[in-house]
C-alpha cells in the first residue's frame, strides 16, 4: 500500500493536512490512525467532555513520572486515541494564542511563523460565529461559536473583572486578547466540532484519501530518507510507503517517541536502548511544556449553578434533549466566560488565563462539591519549567517516560500565589455579592505563602496542553528538530507538524494553534507560496509598563 503522502495521526494537525494536501486531487493521502471511530454521544455531546478523557477506549493513558516538586504526584496526560485525536476528547475551548506568542516563535528561529504570517491561516481555517469583523475567518471548515446558556454567573464574572479594573474584550481571538469576556467553543449545531468533523470526514469522501487503522511502530528509512511507515494491525506487520513524504502528527508525546524509535534523536539515549542512529538530534523529546491550573471554588447562595443538574434524572433529561434536538445543557461545554490578564506591570501581554465554570467540580468530572457553587480555573501561561519525553525501551508498545518537571522553577510558585490571590480579589467584587457564599477551595484558612504553596502542591492539575518536544527552529540550532518548513533536520522526506513543534507554548488552549500548524504546514509541503502576510496590528495595553490592568 502506498500514497504520495502518509500522515501519522488524525488529530488536530493531521486532519487539517489530510484535507489540504488532497483538496486539488493531484496527490493521494493515507492517514494512519490507531484509535477508534469518534461515534456516540460520549464523544459528540459537548457536555459529556469529562467521559472520553477518562476512558481507555479513547485515551492513550499517559501519565507523568512522579513529579518531585508537587509532592511526588503523577499527573495524567490525556491524548486522544480516537478519530480526531485530542480534538475529540478536549474541552472544546478555542483560543488562537496571543500575537506576541507567534512573534516569539519567529524571533527564536522559526522564521515565517510570526503573527503576521499565521493570522491568514487562522482566518482560512475558521468559520467564526460572532467574532470581530475583519479579524476572523467566516468560510473555513472549523466552526467556532459563543456559548448560548446565558447563566447570570457568566456575566458576573466578566463584570467582576471590570470592577477590579481589568479590561473587557468582546473577542479574545480578535484584535484584543487582554481582558474578561465570552469564551469561544469548537461546537456546531450542538455537536463537538472536532478536527475529524471539520476536516477529516470531508477529506475521506475524496477518492484520493484513505484511512488505515494501525499502530505506527517506526519510520522506514533508506539511508537518510524516509520512505514509509511500519505499522502493526492485529498481529500483522506491514509497511505503508510514501512516494513523496511521511508526515508525523502523532502528538507531543508520540511524535518524539516515534522519531527516537526510528533512530532520530539524542545519540546517547538511542545507544542506551540499542537503536541504530540515523540522525543525532539532541532536541527530540526535550523542551516539554504544559499549562498548569488550580480551581478556586466558591459556594453559590442562589440555585442557579449546574449542581442541580448533576443528579441522574436531570442528566437523563439533558441527554434525551440533546439526542433529539442537539440543544440544551448537553449542547455546551459550559465554559462560556473567560479572561486573559497580565500579572504585573512590565508584562507586555497576558500571562494568566481564566476559565469560569458555573459549578464546583473537577475538570475530569470527578469530586463534585456537595452544594451549589462556581469556580475559576486559573494558571500562568508561560511557565519556566521544562521537561522531557524519553524512551522506556526500544519496544514501540511501551509508553514513554514523561517528566514535565512541573513547578521546578521558583518563578512558577510566585506566579501561582498571585493567581490564587488575584482570583480571590475578583470573586470579592460587588458583581458576585448576590451569589457569593463561603470559599470551598482553597478555604479561608489558606492565606500565607506557605499555606498557598501547600495548596498548590496538593491540588495543581494539568490543563492537558503538552507541547514543544520536536521544537521548530533554525537549522543551525542544535536543539531544533524541524526547520521552519517542518522538515526534520538531517532526514529527507520526513516532517513533523503538530503541537510538538511549538518552540514555546502559546497563550491558551492548544487545539486552535495545532490546527493552524496543519494548515500552514500543508502549504510548505505542497511547495505553495505562503498566504500573504497580514498588516493588522494587535492591541497592546498602553499601560503595560506601569500597571497590571
UniProtKB/Swiss-Prot annotation:
Source domain of life: Bacteria
Record field: catalytic activity: choline + A = betaine aldehyde + AH2; betaine aldehyde + NAD(+) + H2O = glycine betaine + NADH + 2 H(+)
UniProt: FAD binding residues: 4-33
Keyword set, alphabetical order: FAD, Flavoprotein, NAD, Oxidoreductase
Any one GO biological process: glycine betaine biosynthetic process from choline
Top EC category: oxidoreductase
Active site: 465 (proton acceptor)
Pathway membership, UniProt: Amine and polyamine biosynthesis; betaine biosynthesis via choline pathway; betaine aldehyde from choline (cytochrome c reductase route): step 1/1
Keyword Cell membrane: no
EC numbers for this chain: 1.1.99.1, 1.2.1.8
Span of the signal peptide: none
Record has GTP-binding as a keyword: no
A GO MF label: choline dehydrogenase activity
InterPro entries the record matches: BetA, FAD/NAD-bd_sf, GMC_OxRdtase, GMC_OxRdtase_N, GMC_OxRtase_C
Pfam families for the chain: GMC_oxred_C, GMC_oxred_N
Cofactor: FAD
Function text: Involved in the biosynthesis of the osmoprotectant glycine betaine. Catalyzes the oxidation of choline to betaine aldehyde and betaine aldehyde to glycine betaine at the same rate.
Similarity section: Belongs to the GMC oxidoreductase family.
Name used for this protein in its record: Oxygen-dependent choline dehydrogenase
Upper lineage: Bacteria, Pseudomonadati, Pseudomonadota, Alphaproteobacteria, Hyphomicrobiales
Gene of this entry: betA
